């Protein structure tokens, strides 16, 4: 009888502990009372991958399955556009950028397009078949000029509308899962397996390799507003580069919430708040330098993984899957 009572008590303790743990996993963070985001659904199975504007109101959204949408109201509504591309190829439009009316689109497989009239007409530029890797990131630099990076870390620059390209690195970084460009022209990338990251500065001939900070594989990496780096690792771990110029100095792991979903991107808004987005509608915000976090109520209701955040001076978007995205409206929603 004593053994039975003891076993029953142990079982009860296990059940109580399990329930309490499962409860605190998803309710550990408070939900913000308001949100600056407006949810949009574009009624498509395509995944939005990038967005760019020619001015405060006119811009384009690109994505998988050849998706290209145009807005003339700052992103409140989006209209279908099409590109003159072979029907048999299912292009993935990964990156778009504008400098005024001059714009560029990079996609896969082997796609690069250029416009000089705000996107009303696009010209396909055919790349050398010996190009290392596939186009991954395009940056409009100014009149007739752009910089292109591939998914193996090759970096090229053109000053004649894409007629010719000059290699800026002699040795690519290797296959990458994430690659970002800083405002100063530097790059940072995460290896395809997430076991190291690499940095490149203008004028360098090769990438500099850095080992990951912990045993957790890296998911993504990017630039803070001050030029220092941030990184997201598996296990929903965030770290901030805390010593300017020292790429080996990082904060301890910041784990805002353990809900079984990782983070895929981070961004800072104009007020200095930090946003982190990830799986299953995970959208968190910190307004005190990552010390405390809140769940965004609009993001939390979305049936989508948030894969990318795009912030510029006039716009901000959180890109999801299957036509889901969030648009910054600023006012409380």
UniProtKB/Swiss-Prot annotation:
Q: Tell me which domain of life the UniProt entry assigns to the organism this sequence originates from.
A: Bacteria
Q: Which Pfam families match?
A: PSII_BNR
Question: Keyword set for this entry?
Answer: Lipoprotein, Membrane, Palmitate, Photosynthesis, Photosystem II, Signal, Thylakoid
Q: Which PROSITE patterns match?
A: PROKAR_LIPOPROTEIN
- Renumbered to this chain, the signal peptide range is 1-23
Entry text on domains: A 7-bladed beta-propeller torus, about 55 by 55 Angstroms, with a depth of about 25 Angstroms and a central pore.
Describe the task this protein carries out.
A factor required for optimal assembly of photosystem II (PSII), acting in the early stages of PSII assembly. Also plays a role in replacement of photodamaged D1 (psbA). Assists YidC in synthesis of chlorophyll-binding proteins.
* Protein name (database record): Photosystem II assembly lipoprotein Ycf48
Organism, as annotated: Parasynechococcus marenigrum (strain WH8102)
| Gene name tied to this protein | ycf48
């Amino acid at each position: 009888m004593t053994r039975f009572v003891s076993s029953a008590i142990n079982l009860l303790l296990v059940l109580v502990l399990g329930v309490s743990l499962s409860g605190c996993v998803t309710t550990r963070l408070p939900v913000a009372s308001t949100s600056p985001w407006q949810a949009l659904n574009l009624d498509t199975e395509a995944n939005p991958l990038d967005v760019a504007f020619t001015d405060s109101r006119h811009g384009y959204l690109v994505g998988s399955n050849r998706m290209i949408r145009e807005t003339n109201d700052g992103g409140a509504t989006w209209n279908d556009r099409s590109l003159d591309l072979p029907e048999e190829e299912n292009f993935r439009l990964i990156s778009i950028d504008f400098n005024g009316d001059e714009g560029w689109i990079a996609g896969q497989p082997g796609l690069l397009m250029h416009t000089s009239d705000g996107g009303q007409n696009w010209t396909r530029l055919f790349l050398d078949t010996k190009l290392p890797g596939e186009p991954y990131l395009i940056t409009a630099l100014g009149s007739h000029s752009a910089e292109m990076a591939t998914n193996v870390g090759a970096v090229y620059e053109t000053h004649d509308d894409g007629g010719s390209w000059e290699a800026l690195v002699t040795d690519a970084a290797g296959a990458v899962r994430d690659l970002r460009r800083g405002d100063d022209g530097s790059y940072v990338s995460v290896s395809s397996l997430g076991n190291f990251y690499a940095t490149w500065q203008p004028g360098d001939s090769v990438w500099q390799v850095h080992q990951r900070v912990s045993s957790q594989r890296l998911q993504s990496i990017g630039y803070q507003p001050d030029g220092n780096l941030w990184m997201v690792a598996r296990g929903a771990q965030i770290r901030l580069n805390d010593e300017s110029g020292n790429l080996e100095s990082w904060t301890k792991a910041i784990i805002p919430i353990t809900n079984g979903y990782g983070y895929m991107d981070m961004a800072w808004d104009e007020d200095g708040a930090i946003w982190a987005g990830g799986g299953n509608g995970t959208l968190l915000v910190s307004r005190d330098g990552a010390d405390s976090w809140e769940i965004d109520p609009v993001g939390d209701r979305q049936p989508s993984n948030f894969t990318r955040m795009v912030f510029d001076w006039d716009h901000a978007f959180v890109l999801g899957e299957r036509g889901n995205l969030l648009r910054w409206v600023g006012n409380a929603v």
